[in-house]
């Protein structure tokens, strides 16, 4: 891990939302388990959220032996921006950058899309369901109002209506990452998500980035099919575990 991304850290955002002291670990292998567990004991952590690459099966099995519960599996895709021409968006859908005032529509779409979402928060029966829903609405709104953690917010419109959104982040000088996406139930099946993804690729190209990466739940086949049709390929996957200490 880099100095900017410690192996394990306290998540004030999750603690404020759920009312339990929470720590996160983005990449946990066998050798890091003692350090992470010691950190949690020292800081009186109640909930640890840890990700483990699926290729580290021995580590995943050790986590299970130590009381960690599997909550979800993420699959990551990547596309070389330079490898092939970026397709054009079909007529009838406009994708533009975020404008002040868009946040109300974006927040509503996030609320609709992520109600009872099959992610690691909702998979944990000890976490309040409504507060789990709020994770994604709050994420979308923060991306608009404070650009945290997003570097860009793209908004899809059909006529005067906001039909969907996508958020982008620059991981470094060569790679962009798609973070959070949503399409209004009223506009699904009309190519809105595809249009947003195409503009995300253009967003990367305009900034001279070489690659775009994106991830989702392994069960989210609809999104994965869209990515594959746009030239993305699967590159890695990881488990998300929760470990309660109370």
Predicted feature descriptions by range:
Residues 43-53, 175, 204-216:
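Conserved GNAT acetyl-CoA-binding A-motif
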Residues 26-104, 238-243:
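Acyl-donor-binding surface of acyltransferase catalytic domains
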Residues 20-27, 89-134:
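Short amphipathic alpha-helix that is part of the acyltransferase structural core
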Residues 55-70, 190, 194, 206, ...:
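Conserved active-site alpha-helix within GNAT-family acetyltransferase domains
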Residues 119-176, 180-183:
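A conserved beta-strand-loop-helix scaffold within acyl/acetyltransferase catalytic domains
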Residues 7-25, 71-74, 150, 170-179, ...:
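A conserved beta-turn-beta hairpin within the catalytic core of GNAT-like acetyltransferases
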Residues 30-38, 180-185, 189-206, 225, ...:
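Conserved acetyl-CoA-binding loop-helix of GNAT-fold acetyltransferases
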Residues 50-58, 185, 214-224, 242-245:
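Conserved beta-strand-loop-alpha-helix junction that forms the acyl-donor binding cleft
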């Amino acid at each position: 891990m880099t100095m900017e991304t410690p192996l394990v850290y306290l998540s004030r955002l999750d603690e404020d939302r759920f009312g339990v002291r929470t720590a996160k670990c983005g990449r946990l292998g066998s050798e890091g388990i003692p350090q992470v567990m010691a950190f949690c004991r020292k800081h009186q952590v109640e909930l640890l959220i840890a990700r483990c690459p699926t290729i580290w099966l021995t580590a995943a099995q050790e986590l299970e032996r130590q009381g960690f519960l599997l909550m979800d599996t993420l699959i990551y895709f990547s596309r070389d921006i330079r490898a092939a021409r970026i397709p054009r968006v079909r007529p009838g859908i406009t994708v533009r950058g975020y404008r002040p005032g868009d946040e109300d529509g974006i927040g509503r779409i996030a609320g609709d899309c992520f109600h009872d979402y099959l992610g690691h928060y909702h998979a944990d029966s000890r976490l309040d369901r409504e507060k789990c829903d709020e994770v994604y609405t709050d994420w979308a709104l923060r991306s608009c109002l404070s650009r945290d953690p997003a570097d860009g917010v793209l908004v899809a419109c059909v006529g005067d209506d906001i039909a969907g959104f996508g958020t982008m982040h620059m991981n470094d000088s060569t790679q962009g990452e798609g973070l959070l996406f949503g399409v209004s139930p009223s506009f699904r099946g009309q190519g809105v998500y595809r249009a947003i993804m195409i503009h995300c690729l253009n967003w990367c190209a305009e900034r001279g980035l070489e690659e775009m990466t994106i991830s989702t739940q392994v069960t989210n086949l609809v999104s994965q099919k869209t990515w594959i049709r746009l030239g993305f390929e699967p590159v890695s996957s990881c488990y998300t575990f929760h470990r309660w200490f109370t």
